[in-house]
Regions:
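Active-site glycine- and acidic-residue-rich loops that bind
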Residues: 126, 140, 191, 248-253
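Alpha-helical metal-binding/catalytic segments enriched in His/Glu/Asp
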Residues: 106, 159-161, 175-218, 249
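Predominant activation on well-ordered alpha-helical scaffold segments within soluble catalytic domains
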Residues: 87, 103, 107, 145-146, ...
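Glycine/charged-rich beta-loop-alpha catalytic/anionic-binding loops adjacent to active sites
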Residues: 84-89, 157-161, 167, 172-184, ...
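N-terminal hydrophobic/helix-forming segments and targeting peptides
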Residues: 1-167, 264-266, 271-274
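A glycine- and small/hydrophobic-rich beta-loop-beta segment
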Residues: 206-274
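Hydrophobic alpha-helical scaffolding
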Residues: 92-96, 184-188, 243-250
Length: 274
């Protein structure tokens, strides 16, 4: 099945990269059902199996894909580029991928024709995003609200994407245990998926309008951090009493979703690690 091929392709490519070869030739024979019926699925699987650390290892991987046209291979490559972006962001250490750094990565999409605007802490406060700001206030790294728009001429539909953007989540005063905190550099995976989707859509020239919203911040412990028992006012005008500071994603997303609704969203895809 296609899923079976997907499960096999990744590990085989991953194991290959640790064998120390200067170059590798990989001949791909049809082994899975392609998405398009012409080999695109096969090509995409092999492309996604490419090691993330290839830029550090200097290994050359040559793919031999019989029966796959250049056009289909190029389409698969463009999809994979979006996945690579999301993967790289999720794996960045939190001392490097701060909210501001995530915003800078989003701004790079302007080169592909994506409209990107980044709001600082003052602008966020002026909007009235009290829940988002409460989560962010415990960190020395200021929050950023990221707005994206991909609107090709003749777009046939609109989809709004909202991604959770916690670049690190300690749990706040409802502190996580160490073993649970170890993966919290990836609590911005929803935001990474949004940015990856915009990159892939722009590269593919998809005939759909996309709008994206990311509330990027950190949830840390400090003398300024929000507390259990605090009452917060959200962008929608509703108030929330905090009973657990480790439920921060619901607060940041509440403001981001309310903003999407204010911008006229009718179909929203929300992406988060909760």
């Amino acid at each position: 099945s296609y899923l079976g091929g997907q499960q096999v392709a990744g590990p085989s490519a991953i194991s290959e990269r640790f064998r120390g070869a200067d170059s590798t030739w990989l001949s791909v024979v049809p082994a899975v059902e392609p998405l398009s019926g012409e080999g695109e699925g096969e090509a995409r699987l092999r492309l996604l199996g490419e090691p993330l650390e290839a830029r550090y290892r200097g290994t050359t991987l040559t793919l031999l894909l019989p029966g796959v046209s250049e056009a289909l291979l190029e389409r698969a490559r463009r999809v994979a580029e979006g996945v690579y972006l999301a993967r790289d962001l999720v794996n960045e250490p939190p001392n490097l991928l701060t909210p501001e750094a995530l915003a800078e990565r989003a701004l790079e999409l302007r080169a592909l024709g994506v409209e990107v605007e980044v709001l600082d802490e003052k602008a966020i406060a002026e909007l009235g995003m009290g829940a988002f700001l409460a989560v962010a206030q415990g960190s020395e790294n200021p929050p950023r609200f990221i707005r994206l728009r991909y609107a090709p001429e003749g777009a046939k539909a609109r989809l709004d994407l909202v991604g959770k953007g916690l670049t690190f989540d300690s749990g706040g005063y409802s502190l996580k245990p160490t073993e649970s905190m170890a993966t919290m550099k990836s609590d911005m995976a929803g935001a990474a998926a949004v940015l990856g989707a915009f990159k892939a859509a722009a590269l593919l020239g998809l005939p759909v309008e996309l709008r994206g919203y990311i509330a990027a911040c950190e949830n840390l412990v400090s003398g300024r951090a929000y507390r259990v028992g605090d009452v917060l006012k959200t962008l929608s005008g509703k108030t929330v009493e905090v009973m657990n500071t480790d439920a921060e994603g619901r607060l940041t997303l509440a403001d981001a979703l309310a903003y999407a609704e204010r911008e006229g969203a009718e179909r929203i895809l929300e992406l988060s690690t909760l």
